[in-house]
Amino acid sequence: MPLYEHVLIARQDLSNAQAEGLIEHFSTVIADNGGKVVDNEYWGVRTLAYKINKNRKGHYAYLRSDAPSAAVQEMERLARLHDDVMRVLTVRVDEHKDGPSVQMQKRDERERGDRGDRGERRERRDRDDRN
């Protein structure tokens, strides 16, 4: 079966649990139509490059699937009809990469803290101590 990667953007006013519920919903749609979801990631709330339906932010979800094209078409159709989903992107890939997606790797790099090659950080002065 062909391999696919899907990115879903849901409305910003959903809770995290509701956004993760959408991932489970679309995973079951793929499974019910003869495919399987290999991996899924919830990327969290991110700022959009431009407004979509008057929203500046959205919940991002990432799915890797191994499914026939009919299952993917049905999942996309239901996602486009769903009120909470603003955008869907599906890409066919030759193989799934092991490990976390590039977006998750970038987030992990940002959360590592200070870089060791920069030396020690100076203490910040208060604005009142300018003299």
UniProtKB/Swiss-Prot annotation:
**Which keywords does this chain's UniProt record carry?**
Ribonucleoprotein, Ribosomal protein, RNA-binding, rRNA-binding
Please report which protein family the annotation says this sequence is part of.
Answer: Belongs to the bacterial ribosomal protein bS6 family.
What InterPro entries does the record tag this protein with?
A: Ribosomal_bS6, Ribosomal_bS6_sf, Ribosomal_S6_plastid/chlpt, Transl_elong_EF1B/ribsomal_bS6
The record's NCBIfam families line, in alphabetical order, gives: S6
What protein name is recorded for this chain? Answer: Small ribosomal subunit protein bS6
Entry GO CC? cytosolic small ribosomal subunit
Give the start-end ranges of region Disordered: 92-131
Function of this protein? Binds together with bS18 to 16S ribosomal RNA.
Classification via HAMAP family: Ribosomal_bS6
Q: What organism is this sequence from?
A: Paracoccus denitrificans (strain Pd 1222)
GO biological-process terms attached to the record? translation
Q: Which GO terms describe its molecular function?
A: small ribosomal subunit rRNA binding; structural constituent of ribosome
Q: Output the superkingdom of the source species.
A: Bacteria
